[in-house]
Amino acid sequence: MNEPTVQPSRTSSAPASPASPRGWSDFCEQHAAAAARELARQYWLFARAHPQPPRADLVSLQFAELFQRHFCREVRESLAGPPGHDYRATAPPRPALPKARSSEDLGPRPACALQHLRRGLRQLFRRRSAGELPGATSDTNDIDTTAASRPGPARKLLPWGLREPPTEALKEVVLRYSLADEAAMDSGARWQRGRLVLRSPGPGHSHFLQLFDPPKSSKPKLQEACSSIREVRPCTRLEMPDNLYTFVLKVQDQTDIIFEVGDEQQLNSWLAELRASTGLGLEHPDTELPLSLAAEPGPARSPRGSTDSLDQGASPGVLLDPACQKTDHFLSCYPWFHGPISRVRAAQLVQLQGPDAHGVFLVRQSESRRGEYVLTFNLQGRAKHLRLVLTERGQCRVQHLHFPSVVDMLRHFQRSPIPLECGAACDVRLSGYVVVLSQAPGSSNTVLFPFSLPHWDSELGHPHLSSVGCPPSHGAEALPGQVTPPEQIFHLVPSPEELANSLRQLELESVSSARDSDYDMDSSSRGHLRAIDNQYTPLSQLCREADV
């Protein structure tokens, strides 16, 4: 009897778990091999117990026929009931997989793909929404409650930011703007193009401004609530001689911004809208005059509302800020201190003689930073501005340099060049200064007093004056007609009476011979005098007459 020889099984009783199939062909190959190994092992076990077993090829054909029948029945039952366990005891139970058209669908699907999509859309439209003020936060529970109240697909797909009404834009315009920072003080205004939007978040909330640069940008470059704006006013012709329709916006703890619109109608419209939004419309009714009124001559106005004093230098009649009053008494007695004149006016004063006045200077109050000061000087015919910081004790700081006083700073820059970005090519030392004196006791208008009057010394280059009076202080504490005790640093200044007599004599002389005098009458200024040359005094007397 030919009986088959029983062969030991070459397969392990506990094979390793097969790797995940990459496709249907791999799936069938993998499970067919596993079923063949199991069938061969069972075949040899059965052959040992039963003599004369059938041939292996016959067993495989019968197994394939029966396998097809049982496999189809198991698949139909697995769709209706819970998934059954695999017939292989060594393999872990696997969840039944639905029918798929590709191998990518064989793995388990994500738990909530729609939820991830909705979260991503919500974040996207949140950034594009121009809704809330900076610092405002939204509560997640409120968002979910609002979304849950929406029926249908809008509740599941659309984010809350898209369904809420957008913030109302009250006013919008494309314009030019410039930041009034330290760089603008040195090199002039640098204009940029942007879009200014005034928005209202709703009743009970403060309006806020947004500045977009470039104009088509969706994210604002600057955004401030209107409640933080402390001043909004039109610029004067002296401040912006080449830009007519401009206004300045002063924001608390921020750099001042100058805006330029297209015409006067837009200027007045924006000023009215901003003043109404900030509540500054009634608090500063006479801060500045409109451009059309400032350019026309008219009757004399009060010192607070007059713009004539801006054309003549300082304005002692205007009440100063408390920050300025703390430090102005260190400078108000000196003839080179011009008080609160504009940057443009200071540049005009030091540029009158062009490159010949190289090193001529004056000291003025800062326009943008109240309580600070600016040294304006002539650099080869161009005006430069250097910011000064003055402490309550009179100490002065210029960039990284510290001085005991402003006079010590001027003495230092008389001997050493002023530190500038251009280096040795822009070497400049202080050589003289522009003088400003009060025209009469108690007068709010000032004029430039040239040093060719009343006596001229060609050797020393400075006048010999008979009086030792000091000009009235620019501070609010100076009374009309009161003469401050002299502190002679550069030269001696005449009394107000002598100045008035000299000015009256100049008016008579200017009628007969305009060029014989160092003044020129300006018809547009209604009798005021303006200096045209010889308005400087050398700084060489600074060391000689100091501490007298």
From Swiss-Prot:
Belongs to the SH2B adapter family. The keyword Nuclease does not apply. Links T-cell receptor activation signal to phospholipase C-gamma-1, GRB2 and phosphatidylinositol 3-kinase. Keywords: Phosphoprotein, SH2 domain. The lineage of its organism: Eukaryota, Metazoa, Chordata, Craniata, Vertebrata. This is SH2B adapter protein 3. Residues 168-279 form the PH domain. It comes from Mus musculus. Gene3D superfamilies: 6.10.140.110, Pleckstrin-homology domain (PH domain)/Phosphotyrosine-binding domain (PTB), SH2 domain. Tyrosine phosphorylated. The keyword Chloroplast does not apply. Residues 336-434 form the SH2 domain.
